[in-house]
Amino acid sequence: MELMNKPLLVPLNTGIQGNVVMEENVRLYGNCELLNVFIGAFTHVASGAWLLNTDIGRYCSIGDGVHILTQQPTKMLTTSPIIYGDIFDELAMVATKAQYPVIRKTIIGNDVWIGSGVKIKTGLTIGDGAVIGAGAVVTKNVAPYSVVGGVPAKVIKMRFPPKIIARLNKIAWWQYKLTDYPLEWDDIDTVLKQIEQLELDKKLSLYVAQKYNVFKEANEVKGRPISP
């Protein structure tokens, strides 16, 4: 049975391993694989995404088939998993088992758009507001509000002019639940003025989203609320 209620939508065919935490108002689609992942509120993850040891901010759009790549050591005698006892336990001798390399956490900021089929090297930071074009292979950190694409991914342009980016960084709008307000989302200057005015009028309060531990049990996907 999939987890499908008001705060979360997580299909039954989602692979869930390790510590998976989601804020409310997260939407996942079929055949995603999650291992030690945090996903912030209002983030949408399309089908077939593989997310490994990754923190994802709020209001993100993760395209279908996005993969956070694993880290494979190249300085050892072999790159084969035969040396790790937990993978080939019946073959690896106790005396020769190697430590599996520590996988660095990948950080994806807030309001990030990642296109279909993007591959991201583990341990990178994708800045707030960044856009990654479909099919890109990301091998370096991505600066906030940059638009990147290609193999390997390179900066194509900045998403907004510097003055707009400065205003976006100042208000950090993702800390609010903006769905509660009638905003003109399609005009960046107008919507920023609206949010700035709401701040001046002290009508905005920080959105403290309910967090859930998400896990599988008895062929069901379950979400256990985490106390504040």
Question: Model segments located where?
Answer:
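Catalytic-loop Lys-Pro-X-Asn motif of eukaryotic-like protein kinases
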Residues: 116, 134, 143-144
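Conserved catalytic-core motifs of eukaryotic protein kinase domains, centered on the activation segment
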Residues: 72-74, 142, 158-159
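Flexible, glycine/small-residue-enriched loop-and-beta-strand segment within the central core
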Residues: 4-124
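Short-chain dehydrogenase/reductase
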Residues: 113, 131, 147-148
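C-terminal segments of enzyme domains that contribute to small-molecule binding surfaces
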Residues: 9-12, 17, 81-121, 152-228
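A generic "structured core" feature
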Residues: 131-133, 137
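Acidic, glycine-centered active-site loop in nucleotide-sugar glycosyltransferases
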Residues: 144, 149-152
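Conserved catalytic segment of ABC-fold P-loop ATPases
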Residues: 127-130, 143-145
